[in-house]
């Protein structure tokens, strides 16, 4: 089997240590978690004993890297002053929590411009990220900008948007990118065959730079190509399809990256079925 770091977004509702039991049963080599309930603004303190157990278990299971995903409510592109302020503070807090958990990355959605202009919205994200890095000056946690599907007023669905932000980040050692395959596809970057995959990642390399790519959110899409609709789907069963999903995880250019699945979890069989599919794909050879 090819040596690719794959894993899932793991639910922590049963506690941090329990989440790693789930990760182990799914053979995860890397994981993504929320550090708290993602549907609110409140931050319950991380319990010291739970954190210690989590870190010990991480070491035991050799799970790395760990990605902490920002909650759903923050919008670092928001024109609303109150929401923007809370979003920036959330980012700072999330970086501090990631550090406590020995997580390497904090993944953020670039956000929605609402009724603002694209340029204003992108500049807001730049300010938010620069502020958060400044406020966590001694941290090594890297902020990952995740591309979007371009749904509604979302920004960040074009590589040029991501480049605009990174160009204006003062400490470039603390910034990177997550590319979500479902979002790429919905935003008009084709991934269904070798030629399309090469074209998409060559374009990313030319505009943003592969050195900034730290993570792949490995999801099939339940919405059609260039639909600007964000709908994750089970691996190989969506519009990207079996061939595209297989080619993505066996593409040599991406083989050093963590592939994290954020596929639907409607039944207990969903994750194991997606795991099975990934393991089948990894029986193939890398291609270049």
Put a short name on every predicted segment:
Residues 32, 214-217, 256-263:
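Conserved active-site loop/cleft motifs that coordinate metal ions or position small ligands
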Residues 9-13, 36-38, 71-73, 111-113, ...:
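Active-site beta-loop-alpha junctions enriched in small/polar residues
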